[in-house]
């Protein structure tokens, strides 16, 4: 007799726990979980009691967070698109990234920061769009104010980013606050850096009122910038991430290399050096770079020499459809023809050892 669908949901958390390593932020798996709020809250493995309480109490916020997971993972993949580790996700793994983030590396620091930022962004946006019962536009942005251009009236809908930060801190940090180990402190630091990054790009937008746009009266509001700005900023922080060690009393960090400055609240921190990600490695969670597309003319991280780790590359000849011979027609359209373009695609060779192909 076939088990009912509800029975499958009851077994799913236990099955995922058996099959995948424990990674702190199991709420990342909310991207792949559909159905009612009860199904989502009770069947995402690894949530602590505080997270489940918030999940049951605010199902609309959880839906926003779930949609936000897809956005910040896409941003992570954009930032790492030219690197050996490309922020690839594992759809059937409740940790979303597998074992790779078990290491306290730069990559872990970035993922925790961008995920925390993504929660702030998703909740704040949902507040402004009227999708959440617990918040709306920023209630503090009312009345008259002044800036370098003079007096203006607060109007429109200012993004309520303080609410987004408050909820993100309560939900995302809940599991880390239960632990007192070094990794929990690292995650909390990078989570906070991610939240602060979103607020950094809050900008004032204004609309002029008056005869012929004379701007005798201005109405202004605060709006978040596109999430790409946050991603670009955290990418720079990733490249300048600071390696740290725990201090003697185990309550904070000190720099691993005394020549470097102490990390600020905006910096990303990490404990362990990253693997090279060249070959498939179960323990490191690395998928390797065999089969990855590389750039023959680049001298950067996406070059065939760097991406392929010196193993060489294969070249295939492919054709693709592109737009060509585009012309502007008055008024107001651009019309193009479809053309076939021939090009060479270079992909990294596999290691000579056969064990690279064993699935993780």
Swiss-Prot record:
Name the record gives this protein: Protein Wnt-2
Gene label: WNT2
Signal sequence annotation: 1-25
InterPro entries: Wnt, Wnt2, Wnt_C, Wnt_CS
Function: Ligand for members of the frizzled family of seven transmembrane receptors. Functions in the canonical Wnt signaling pathway that results in activation of transcription factors of the TCF/LEF family.
Family, per entry: Belongs to the Wnt family.
Glycosylation site positions: 295
Lipid addition sites, O-palmitoleoyl serine: 212
This protein's UniProt keywords: Developmental protein, Disulfide bond, Extracellular matrix, Glycoprotein, Lipoprotein, Secreted, Signal, Wnt signaling pathway
Disulfide bond annotation, renumbered to this chain: 76-87, 127-135, 137-157, 206-220, 208-215, 278-309, 294-304, 308-348, 324-339, 326-336, 331-332
GO MF term set: cytokine activity; frizzled binding
Top-level taxon: Eukaryota
A GO cellular component annotation in the UniProt record: cytoplasm
Family matches, as Pfam families: wnt (PF00110)
Cellular compartment(s): Secreted, Extracellular space, Extracellular matrix; Secreted
Post-translational modification: Palmitoleoylation is required for efficient binding to frizzled receptors. Depalmitoleoylation leads to Wnt signaling pathway inhibition.
Biological processes annotated in GO: canonical Wnt signaling pathway; cell fate commitment; cell proliferation in midbrain; cell-cell signaling; cellular response to transforming growth factor beta stimulus; mammary gland epithelium development; midbrain dopaminergic neuron differentiation; positive regulation of fibroblast proliferation
């Amino acid at each position: 007799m076939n088990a009912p669908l509800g029975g499958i949901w009851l077994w799913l958390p236990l099955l995922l726990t058996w099959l995948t390593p424990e990674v702190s932020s199991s709420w990342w798996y909310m991207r792949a979980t559909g159905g009612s709020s009860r199904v989502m809250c009770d069947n995402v493995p690894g949530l602590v009691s505080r997270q489940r309480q918030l999940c049951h109490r605010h199902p609309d916020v959880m839906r926003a967070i779930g949609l936000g997971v897809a956005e910040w993972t896409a941003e992570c993949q954009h930032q790492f698109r030219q690197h050996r580790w490309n922020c690839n996700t594992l759809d059937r793994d409740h940790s979303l990234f597998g074992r790779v983030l078990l290491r306290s590396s730069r990559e872990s620091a970035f993922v925790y920061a961008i995920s925390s930022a993504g929660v702030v962004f998703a909740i704040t946006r949902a507040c402004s769009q009227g999708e959440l019962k617990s918040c709306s536009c920023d209630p503090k942005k009312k009345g008259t104010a002044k800036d370098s251009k003079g007096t203006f009236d607060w109007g429109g809908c200012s993004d309520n980013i303080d609410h987004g930060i408050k909820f993100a801190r309560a939900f995302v940090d809940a599991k880390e606050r239960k632990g007192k180990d070094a990794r929990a402190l690292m995650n909390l630091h990078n989570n906070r850096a991610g939240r602060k990054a979103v607020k950094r790009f809050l900008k004032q937008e204004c609309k002029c009122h008056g005869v012929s746009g004379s701007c005798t009266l201005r109405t202004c509001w605060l709006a978040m910038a596109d999430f790409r700005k946050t991603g670009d900023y955290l990418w720079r922080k990733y490249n300048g991430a600071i390696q740290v060690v725990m201090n003697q009393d185990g309550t904070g960090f000190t720099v691993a290399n005394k020549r470097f400055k102490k990390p600020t609240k905006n910096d990303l921190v990490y404990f362990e050096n990253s693997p090279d990600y060249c070959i498939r490695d179960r323990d490191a969670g690395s998928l390797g770079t065999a089969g990855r597309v590389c750039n023959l003319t680049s001298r950067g991280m996406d070059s065939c020499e760097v991406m392929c780790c010196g193993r060489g590359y294969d070249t295939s000849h492919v054709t693709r459809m592109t737009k060509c011979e585009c012309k502007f027609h008055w008024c107001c359209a651009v019309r193009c023809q479809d053309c076939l373009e021939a090009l060479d695609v270079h992909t990294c060779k596999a290691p000579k050892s056969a064990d690279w192909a064993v699935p993780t």
